[in-house]
């Protein structure tokens, strides 16, 4: 094929002998002339050379390795002092493109395929040693590490069948690109996270150390990618977080697995996305859109993340052993996903601001109060032992057709911030409480600071002896089936509890409904099963309640049926003023 150029013609060899300059010459040639550059099998050692390629508006090209056999390796370069323009402390291994000054200049469409990258020779491996404690949580004060592949302002770049291993830093960055495709990429121990400053006194909430990041790019698609991280901090156990006094030693060292952030107008607002007319007026919708499909993340502070004017569609993804499985700080649709925190729940996170937000899925908005963000969780499965399956913060949230299963001291759904949510809709879910422990403040479902809550047609099954507590903000609790030991607590301005069924055949407990300083509460058309006639007075408690109505509820004591007319007066118990 006349369009195929052999990299070996430029002196590139797969024998481990440094040939970085030859690699640079070969790639520059193919970017200028077009075609496919075929790399030989074996270890292609770039030495201390770092590839920085910046050919604008050239022909399309392809960088192709021998499948499963071409490995790019690099000799160590020591960290440098971080500057204000870029957070990594070592130059990127391979950079294609650059920040353009005009929209019409960009890197043409290209494919990078069937190439492995290994940086085992990197000395900055993360985690301090005992003789470098003055440098904080890493061997040097400037230890965000490196970036394996940096793609900037490119038209339709495709990274396919890429494997990246042993990089202290980050894997792939797509910056201000259009229609990027990242497919079948696997990373092993590609991670970093300098949570502690060099003086050991300050902490960073936001840093580097990711597998894949799409930043300020239009229409990115990430599919069939996997990020495995087993890197942990290795340091003096006495070194602890100034924030929560948790030790760093042995804890996850990795920030984010896969995430997308920033709208395409981030940075220079005068530079439009390639082929897109993206208005930069402050009053227009500036959101970027991306898809993350069939991906897996293990061993990061955040498994997946959406942030800062992004709308991401996550489909059929799995998050295992991450402090937070999915962190949704903007808009997102999560569907058909699996989040498992059963093992990592036994570890507290030493990074500032994370512990209070923890959950399988964290719906929030850290950058400010913004209820315009739409957040959806559909047809997914979440398990937890200690933290909530779902954390609520801000925005408009829909949780539908999911299975949430908790053990020990975990919770199902909780509000974790003081910001106000516009609307929370929780419907048609299976909520399973399995072997929980009695604790001081159970509150397995707590939805507060919400303008309107719709909790409807859910099936809640409490398999334990301990009671499950529900505290739901203003709105409706309608047509749900509660099986097990339940206690409902209300402090709302308005609430409609209608058409629900409460029973506990296994433990024969009596449900409790407690209304404290509540207003405009309507309790109607519910079916309540109790198993002890003497408990009939212990069902509903009222304190400082105004406008409470009790209409057409059915109470069943074993096989005896009581209508509301015969027991209404004895059923309602008032205390306080």
Model-derived regions, located:
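Short "repeat-start/strand-capping" segments in structured domains, especially the N-termini
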Residues: 57-59, 108, 154-158, 176-181, ...
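Consensus "Asn ladder" position of solenoid repeat domains
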Residues: 115, 162, 185, 225, ...
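Glycine-centered low-complexity coil/loop motifs and glycine-rich tracts
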Residues: 12, 115, 119-122, 166-168, ...
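Beta-strand-rich extracellular passenger or scaffold domains
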Residues: 38, 44-52, 70-76, 92-96, ...
